[in-house]
């Protein structure tokens, strides 16, 4: 009890000291403060440096205008950061376990990872490449994010209500993929294209039968928006030639109902350096062009629904002969080794760049559609797919530089931006009139690039992010493995200007998307008892007072709760060999009050956000005493948020002991603690008086804080009653301890209330009558 009072006094002294320090600084001579001119001079900054800093600076407490979602490459995650500040906000765990979010550690998230098992094997990593935001009428709606795994052909669904991965689907017929994810205008379907050809379904065939037995393809995953899940039963694929299919895009507006997919290595070359053959890179770049696949996906969906498919591994596949008969797939020559097919915002044009060509090609959808309608074909490929002549489909070719790769669009009509990998530049150009307008050097070897809403019907302009493959000398050296470099570029004027370099320290990002921050509406808490991976209330939801430990044979099940600053139960007793299941519910309602849980030496880990229920399991196969504690700092008494798992050895015979401390608290101690509770309640009443005297209901964050403070204070009634009950019996030791718990709940309520009071003061609240 005395230690608790001591902590309170120390906190009070710290607060008073901080206020005094601020007052001294305010009263200090102005000579101690540097002027902007002095800072600029001392750091050797130019006027352009200062302007760039001002353009990217987001003041403390303020937020970015845009939020970017970047693939995380080998990290298997998605990186979230703000634009223009370029501050990293979060890594979203997707395809591999991640301990901070406890993804792959609790049973609920393990179930999501298990969805991504292939051939009965756990796949514990992923190579994320191409994220796609859900769309409504061709523009981002901020509801869902999709991301692919190139290494193991899979797609994942992330719900942007809480930035958690909800589903993983493994492609049932592909052995690899690269071109995913891309969404249709209203997110009816998500495209996933195969990359390296292989027999569909996973069968074996020798490379000598590459042309006959190896195939490419594209899968259209049906998305059920109401459930927020991909529906395998309503999804289908098209069999395609063994060209290496790459990236895709859906048509927009004028080209609605169609999709477009790149390819490379249309030579169908098979390497083999060890056999004395030239490598893949030589044989796969022999031709001057590769093939763009133009697919009538709406008609294909009808064909699949009509049952004109072959079932492979339980999946509907429209075979090539059916696609030809139904008029679903058409080919057009494209610049060789492309990586990106990008439909313009109005859907009238498609731009494609080949890394081995210095031009970007602009195709006219009107010309393509006219050729299809008139059956104006130059011939057929070896598999019978009709080919539209390049000249028939082409609008213009624009020389941009060496290694053109990926294109995104500006809010200004006709303006596009293309990455130039070899030149290490970004090109700004007019795709309607076929003119190069500007080029800007970047650092170094740009891959993809991203503009704000740049692949939608309504690009926002303002900023471009260059996703560079090499950083070389741009950052502090950290060893041979360098961070990646994302460079922010101002595209608001007629000339591009470089603003900022952002190191990306984990994984090699590929593609990114950026959305207006105002379109994202993430929650800050769950309904109490939520299984966050399914969105449903868990059958293991536990309220205060419902905590229990149950045994059935050698199975021990614990239903517990987490709240500042204790884990209930605090003692878990099991026998060696028991299978232990612990269901925990975070009872907090306050924003950002996450709790963690771990059991020493048993590889148990979990993260519980406010309202979440999740489960951890382990077999108590080692006897001994194993502490557990909250791994997320949550309060002044965080270190005291602890407990023990006692694993009794086989054959152990219990000994009677007394848990009561030798030093007993007295009536005087009890009365001191009660006095502290009364004084604390007076502070709370004063804070409540201030808040209710303001227009606090106009501030949603304050309303949430008030609700949480009220709930925390409500918890105090239980220990208060127990303290009074024990005191009435003359058991002042127990009464003092329960009074201390009563005070703990008061302190938490006061802390939340003071946060609400500060928020109102800083955000201009007004008195009400």
PLM-predicted stretches and their roles:
Residues 167, 583-613, 636-644:
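Histidine- and aromatic-enriched segments that form or immediately flank copper-ligand environments
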Residues 663-687, 724-769:
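C-terminal amphipathic alpha-helix
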Residues 545-546, 608-664:
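Extracellular/periplasmic metallocenter environments
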Residues 33-548, 617, 753, 761:
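Predominantly soluble domains enriched in secretory-pathway, periplasmic, or organellar proteins
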Residues 16-27:
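Bacterial N-terminal signal peptides
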Residues 549-579:
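N-terminal edge beta-strand
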Residues 662-718:
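Amphipathic, heptad-repeat alpha-helical segments
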Residues 3-18:
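Bacterial N-terminal signal peptides that target proteins for export
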